């Protein structure tokens, strides 16, 4: 129990690591919080530093969700433990202790959390996400489709233990995308790499 609690706290710290800020400072000499959308995620890093660094940021943001949950599967056989570990990493990205409790939008980190425990369900949701991005041009809309469809897919496929996690993720992602949603409603959202999502 103590080990589980320590790992959940550690997962929050791992999730808090602002790779976008670190990479942009090291390789571009800039603070992404002051340029583009001001977001610390891969989408804004792509915008201000290029696709290569954006992809690297995306990889590490996914990894900081993936790694804690994988370790949790070795520490415990409880889906509740995986849920708490994953949420800790996601909340770390959203409210980083290294960025005065501010952060990114947590789409990439949420994907990382789900890969070890709901891979096929996530893959199907990602296909829907990609389709909507391709058809609409809005990365933010695709992200919202992904997190909205996931609880339904989990229910259909009988992965009931992770439905609560998926619903919490959906709520967090909608909250972190509230400005994007307002722009979508007003028809002011930017398309493709200019969108603020990941």
From Swiss-Prot:
Coiled coil: none annotated. GO terms for cellular component: plasma membrane. Pathway: Lipid metabolism; phospholipid metabolism. It comes from the Bacteria. The chain crosses the membrane at residues 2-22, 53-73, 79-99, 113-133, 152-172. One of its GO terms (molecular function) is acyl-phosphate glycerol-3-phosphate acyltransferase activity. It catalyses: an acyl phosphate + sn-glycerol 3-phosphate = a 1-acyl-sn-glycero-3-phosphate + phosphate. Its EC number is 2.3.1.275. InterPro entries: G3P_acylTferase_PlsY. Belongs to the PlsY family. Catalyzes the transfer of an acyl group from acyl-phosphate (acyl-PO(4)) to glycerol-3-phosphate (G3P) to form lysophosphatidic acid (LPA). This enzyme utilizes acyl-phosphate as fatty acyl donor, but not acyl-CoA or acyl-ACP. PANTHER family: GLYCEROL-3-PHOSPHATE ACYLTRANSFERASE-RELATED, INNER MEMBRANE PROTEIN YGIH. Probably interacts with PlsX. This is Glycerol-3-phosphate acyltransferase. It comes from Lawsonia intracellularis (strain PHE/MN1-00).
């Amino acid at each position: 129990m103590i080990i589980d609690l320590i790992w959940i706290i550690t997962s929050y710290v791992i999730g808090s690591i602002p790779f976008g800020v670190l990479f942009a400072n090291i390789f571009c000499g800039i603070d992404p919080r002051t340029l583009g959308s001001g977001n610390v995620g891969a989408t804004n890093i792509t915008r201000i530093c290029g696709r290569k660094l954006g992809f690297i940021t995306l990889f590490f943001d996914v990894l900081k969700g993936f790694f804690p949950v994988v370790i949790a599967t070795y520490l415990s056989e409880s889906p509740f433990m995986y849920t708490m570990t994953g949420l800790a990493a996601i909340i770390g990205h959203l409210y980083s202790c290294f960025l005065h409790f501010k952060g990114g939008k947590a789409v990439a980190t949420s994907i990382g959390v789900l890969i070890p425990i709901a891979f096929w369900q996530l893959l199907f949701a990602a296909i829907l996400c990609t389709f909507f991005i391709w058809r609409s041009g809005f990365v933010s809309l695709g992200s919202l489709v992904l997190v909205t469809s996931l609880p339904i897919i989990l229910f259909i496929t009988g992965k009931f233990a992770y439905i609560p996690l998926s619903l919490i993720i959906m709520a967090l992602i909608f909250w972190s995308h509230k400005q994007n949603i307002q722009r979508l409603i007003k028809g002011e959202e930017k398309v493709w790499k200019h969108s603020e999502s990941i």
